[in-house]
Amino acid sequence: MDDLVSVIIPYYKKRNFVKETVVSVLNQSYDSLEILIIYDDTNLNDLEFLQEISKLDNRIKIINNNKRLGAGLSRNKGIEQSNGKYIAFIDADDTWAPDKLKEQISFMKKNNYQI
């Protein structure tokens, strides 16, 4: 099995984009991953929306900050909750090319990067 990558997505008011973001991560050719969406908002409707998105795949987890912490602290919280050997960040309004993780992991292993 490939080494697990924890993909951390800080979420704040990106409802119109986040599903496309999650789908782009799920469509990675490197599939040993978990997705941690760090909910950094107070709108309960958005939290329910994210919970629906999490039903797309059992590798998706929603972590609720319960108060506004900002993107940096949300990323830190994601790291604390992660299980992966590797950490990757993507913003909730971004997408990845399908081979992004595969190429990054391959490059790091090939060049003996210390983890």
Predicted regions and their residues:
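Nucleotide-sugar donor-binding/catalytic module of glycosyltransferases
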Residues: 1-115
